[in-house]
């Protein structure tokens, strides 16, 4: 099996997300990958709410919520003694995941099949479908 450098794991704090994190950590432990990046994507604030709060407050909110969602993944990586980079993006999930995969030169995206998206999603979940449609690297879905 050939080794890849970077894996990008989309993290939302859901049980399926935790399983995706564990899968990526197992790939690092087995020598399949050398680097793992955890990414949480926060939805952008729009409309009236964005006009009543400062940019600093919005950034702080996204950072706090992103760190909450990433906490479990960071804990799992620590237990596995794997060093992981954490990232918080803002915007449409599929687009942000695609852009981070390119930016990090990730050779694989790993994510849960359904997470915290309001609706449970149909079949794979809307975010997973969006990512599969837009990234140029293999996508591993974990349920």
Tell me what each language-model feature is.
Residues 2, 75-109:
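Structural beta-alpha unit
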Residues 2-52:
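Small/aliphatic-rich secondary-structure junction motif
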Residues 18-26, 71, 98, 102:
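Amphipathic, non-transmembrane alpha-helical secondary structure
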Residues 37-39, 85-89, 140:
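General small-molecule cofactor/ligand-binding pocket signal
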Residues 53, 88-92, 114:
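Short beta->alpha linker loops
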Residues 55-68:
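A short acidic, glycine-rich active-site loop
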Residues 99-143:
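Gly/Ser-rich helix-loop-strand patches that form or flank binding pockets
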């Amino acid at each position: 099996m050939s080794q890849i450098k970077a894996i990008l794991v989309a993290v939302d704090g859901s049980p399926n997300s935790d399983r995706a994190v564990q899968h990526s950590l197992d790939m690092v432990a087995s020598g399949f990958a050398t680097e793992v990046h955890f990414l949480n994507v926060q939805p952008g604030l729009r409309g009236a709410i964005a006009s009543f709060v400062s940019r600093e407050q919005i950034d702080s909110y996204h950072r706090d919520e992103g760190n909450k969602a990433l906490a479990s993944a960071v804990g799992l990586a620590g237990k596995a003694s794997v060093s992981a980079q954490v990232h918080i993006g803002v915007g449409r999930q599929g687009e942000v995941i695609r852009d981070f995969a390119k930016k990090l030169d990730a050779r694989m995206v790993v994510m849960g099949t359904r997470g915290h998206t309001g609706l449970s999603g149909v079949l794979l979940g809307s975010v997973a479908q969006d990512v599969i449609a837009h990234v140029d690297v293999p996508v591993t879905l974990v349920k």
